[in-house]
Amino acid sequence: MTDMPPWEPPFNGDEAAALFGALDRQRTTVRWKCADLDTAGLSATTGRSRLTLGGLLKHLAVQEDYCFQVKILGVPMPAPWDLTVWETEGDDWEFDSAAADAPDELYSLWDSAVARSRAAVAEITERGGLSSAAAISLPDGSPVNVRRMVMDLVEEYGRHTGHADILREAVDGRVGEDPPWPVSD
């Protein structure tokens, strides 16, 4: 099956390939749902919700860095994130502040965060893979493994991929689970 889309998780891969493949599939779908939009498209809401595609991009960029950099690798949040902003601006800062960001800035924030996360996968693999301890621990000091942290991020994407489906359809009618893929007959 060489004609599979590049975002399709492997059908016969090991646990790490399946888990990171599932994460990449969610990433690809969210990025496609948010692609090629101007400020109005990224700022559009539906119903009574304040949620926007731009807000989702920024939120997921934060989540990528917080998961891989802080929770797993134990390094500080990279630029441009400043964790004190949530203390002063509230828990929804990334969602609300996205309205002031240009589309190229939002796409760049997300793309850069995903690139950092993908680079972190090599370090994770080198230090023991999914079963290795993440940098964070439970309040009682018990270790948390990398597997759980990555599963949490897959869950976060799953939740917001559904939101992105609804928001994008409201913007311009784009529907579908996966980006178009050229398949040769």
What are these regions (language model features)?
Residues 2-9, 16, 20-91, 133-185:
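Short, contiguous alpha-helical
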Residues 90-132, 147-157:
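Acidic/histidine-rich alpha-helical segments that form the ligand environment
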